[in-house]
């Protein structure tokens, strides 16, 4: 069984030596371990340092594309290298490499296809109280959307089977952690989590410049991915609000018309009720159309899965003719 440990990097020449020194060279149940570095357009010697440290493969972008794109490129390259298991870790040595054995154990034992390393959020000293609260809140939202019980949704310390990696597609350009969890839940990928340890903080995060921007982009990612995979539920939920409001206003008009003698009044209630009903029906129809598009997308994903499997198999066969 072959394990590929991928490390997305951006200007990490100083932290890479500590990260590589912490990575395991052998593990029970694993025959081969190889290291893959994805250089996201670094302006320092990240790629050269990675090769000097013994990286088996270095993928370098000519310019910065973002963490999500680096992560997905790593998955595709790891598959081409013939990986049976892929572990993703950070280049800033945030996660302890000694825990990779714990991370891959559920996969080796065939208990999961995707394993998340759960950090002790409350014990991380450099996390502010606000950040700890938002981490817990965000994880709770993702658990609801993805229908899994992972307590640390933003952890980047993860292990994937070859089959899980083939199924995942990163659509947003911000961060992969939330999106892939929601995707995995929608695609029935077996997920579990294990407790892990963290190292001290080496530098500030390069993923976002402020908590507010991070929250906004994370919420946008979760919204887009949820609507992508649950369009009918989303649009019909909105439609039901308009239709219920329309029914209440129309019932109010009928009640007043029955109990009040003389010519009917409150015609404005009927007008507003009619407008709300039209909006509700339009939104419901949009939900049906979006659901049909989603069904077509699922068929496309099946074709993409077949193409990826064939391409990865052919590439790994050429690299390892034995």
Where do the protein language model's features map onto the residues?
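Cell-envelope/extracellular polymer assembly enzymes that use nucleotide-activated donors
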Residues: 2-4, 34, 179
């Amino acid at each position: 069984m072959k394990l590929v440990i991928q490390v997305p990097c951006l200007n990490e020449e100083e932290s890479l030596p500590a990260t590589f020194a912490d990575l395991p060279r052998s593990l029970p149940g694993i025959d081969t371990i190889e290291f893959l570095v994805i250089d996201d357009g670094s302006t320092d010697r990240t790629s050269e340092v990675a090769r000097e440290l013994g990286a088996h493969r270095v993928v370098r972008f000519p310019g910065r594309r973002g963490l999500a794109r680096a992560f997905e490129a790593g998955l595709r390259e790891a598959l081409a290298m013939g990986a049976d298991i892929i572990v993703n870790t950070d280049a800033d040595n945030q996660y302890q490499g000694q825990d990779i054995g714990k991370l891959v154990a559920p996969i080796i034992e065939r208990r999961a296809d995707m394993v998340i390393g759960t950090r002790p959020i409350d014990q991380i000293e450099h996390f502010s109280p606000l950040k700890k609260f938002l981490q817990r809140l965000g994880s709770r939202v993702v658990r609801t959307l993805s229908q899994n019980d992972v307590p640390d949704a933003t952890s980047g310390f993860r292990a994937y089977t070859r089959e899980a990696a083939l199924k995942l597609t990163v659509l947003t350009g911000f961060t992969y952690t939330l999106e892939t969890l929601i995707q995995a839940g929608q695609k029935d990928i077996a997920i579990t989590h294990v407790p892990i340890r963290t190292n001290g903080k080496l530098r500030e995060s390069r993923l976002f410049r402020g908590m507010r921007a991070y929250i906004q982009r994370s919420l946008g990612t979760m919204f887009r991915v949820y609507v992508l995979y649950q369009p009918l539920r989303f649009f019909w939920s909105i439609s039901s609000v308009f239709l219920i409001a329309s029914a209440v206003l129309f019932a109010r008009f009928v009640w007043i018309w029955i109990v009040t003698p003389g010519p009917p009044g409150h015609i404005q209630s009927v007008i507003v009720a009619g407008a709300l009903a039209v909006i509700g029906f339009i939104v419901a129809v949009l939900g049906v159309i979006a659901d049909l598009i989603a069904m077509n997308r699922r068929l496309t994903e099946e074709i993409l899965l077949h193409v990826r499997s064939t391409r990865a198999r052919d590439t790994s066969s050429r690299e390892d003719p034995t």
